Amino acid sequence: MVKKLFFIATLLYIGATVSAENYLVKSPDGKIVAELNTNKSLSLQFKYNGSILLQESSIGVTLNDGMDMGKNPKVASHKLSNHKETIHAPFYRQQNFETGYQELNLKLKNGFGIILRAYDEGVAYRFYTQRKGKTIILNETAAYQFGKDKKAWLPYTTTPEKPFAMAFQNIYHETRLDTAKQDLAFLPATVDCGKAKVTILESDLEKYPGMWLKANSSELDKEKGILRAAFAPYPKEMAYYPWRHMSHVKSACDYIATSTGKRNYPWRIFAITEHDTQMPTNNLVYALAAPNKIGDTSWIKPGKVAWDWWNDWNLKGVDFKAGINFETYKYYIDFAHNHGLEYIVLDEGWYNSKEGSILKPIDDIQLPKLIEYGKSKGVDIVLWAVFNVMDENLETICKTYADMGIKGFKVDFMDRDDQTAIEMVERLAACTAKHHLILDLHGIYKPHGLNRTYPNILNYESVFGMEECRWTEAKNDMPLYDVTFPYIRMMAGQVDFTPGAMRNGTRDNWKAIYTKPISMGTRCHQAACYIVQDSPFTMLADTPTNYEADEPYTRYIASLPVVFDKTIVPQGEIGKYIVTARKKGNNWYIGGQSNWDERTLTLKFDFLTDGDYEAIVLKDGINANHDAEDYKIEKSVINQKSELKIHLASGGGFVIKIIKK
């Protein structure tokens, strides 16, 4: 629900005879000024506290009839207005938040228009068209000019030979723009402009491909530090891989989208943050997304999950053969029940994925019996599926499994973000919501606010998460990544990082083991993921028998909430460390993580209300630099005037539960 309060606004209407000029919008606090220039071409620039962050940058949309919004724009009218909103945000990092903006609606001739907004948190624009019939969009142009000496954090495609076909999982490359690779980079991406950082995102992506960025497309781009937009072309012909019945683009058209002539285009967002600690809680993507389309959300249950795939179904000391069978999943359900976890996920293997026979569960799991057993223990079941396999028989699959008692799907292997992929995800979101099924989206592009529109989408992957520990190389520095992506990727939305490793490695002794994976960094670094990361549907990724071997630690992480009333980041620096504090009811939860550098932090608790609190601290043990599994639990009484020094080992972390007395 959105409550819009429109206060006195300056409304300025200018007729069709207006000459080309500049149009300004200012953020409510006056720090951000964005300017649209309509002289010969359409361009955007903006300043923060008087310093130029984005230099004059050309933008536009080209249609197949030859119309180009960015060339020789003719202004028909413009309207300037001011707005405030209070946004209710279920299953988000804030239960509610307020935002305000100044908006320019610039109507152009020939059925084009652009909306530009300035928030205290950044700048956003979107195109719109008001034309008859269908429209084919040849391309959208954007040449964001920052300056060649600016530093950027770019996540490149992992398949340069076929750049748009990938899982959107890569580390961030920290680089100057003029020395950046020419490979395509997916969003979000951040540029350090000196006075502030600018993070490029998008929201309300509907019937349209996702945006990518490319540096150094030409010598001119290199000289000016331009990041140029790119988009996956519209698919012409699809084919299937011989495994998982997974579809892929075999050939593509020479345009990026096909649509109706009357529509809004996606929001292009520049989140502006003076301090790194503002980055993980920037709300622009959520604020700019289309509001809730499904109505009642009381049936949606966030929670923690006992998961099979990461630990390779490894159970120790049991009297049955562990694997994809009833007895194994019964054990997972018992573990979930005994530790207060809401779900288990049945990952790949519960049906013959090569055949795509999703309506035929394998006999060994006895799915109806397993569902009934889960019900008796208060544990619900979520099923894994491949996107296109589910989409090809969507209504039947949703109804069949909802009627059976399944509560959701973990849908995997989209591996593209062309227009048809975007449309497929929305179809899945709408149909699963109709049948009261939740979604956890894997192998997918970054969030773009669809979780606001369809709140049954509880999580997204699009992260270099814990699965990488099964096969990656040590050079892909995960502790570094873990204190980088919360500042950048999490601006886009929640993240299914799948933490919880009980086998933990130091910088010197970590290695990839596919069947018995080890995390990089300490066990407390893993625990901190549950607080640092926005994740309302989150895994306990290791095997139940590993957790049962350390009940104090397991019960500690199992007791942590997954949704919160408020989130702040009191301390942190991108690529070095992060400290996140979240409020739930009268209690607070703090999580902190470091890169491979040891550090000692002084924590203050001035965000607490009056009174005493019990602080239950989970922290790296004295020998955690040698044995990353070493930890300690301590208790003390604190109040809002207290300070606490806490040491983080190399790749370390901590969690504090702060319980009101």
Language-model features: locations:
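Carbohydrate-binding surface patches
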Residues: 573-614, 654-655
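Aromatic- and carboxylate-enriched substrate-binding clefts and catalytic-loop regions
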Residues: 347-522
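Conserved, mostly hydrophobic/aromatic
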Residues: 336, 412, 439, 532, ...
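An acidic-aromatic substrate-binding cleft motif
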Residues: 256-335, 339
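Bacterial Sec-dependent N-terminal signal peptides
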Residues: 1-22
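N-terminal accessory beta-strand-rich subdomains and adjacent acidic, glycine-rich linkers
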Residues: 22-287
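Glycan-recognition and catalytic regions of carbohydrate-active enzymes
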Residues: 542-589, 593, 625-629
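C-terminal beta-strand-rich structural cap/linker in extracellular carbohydrate-active enzymes
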Residues: 635-661
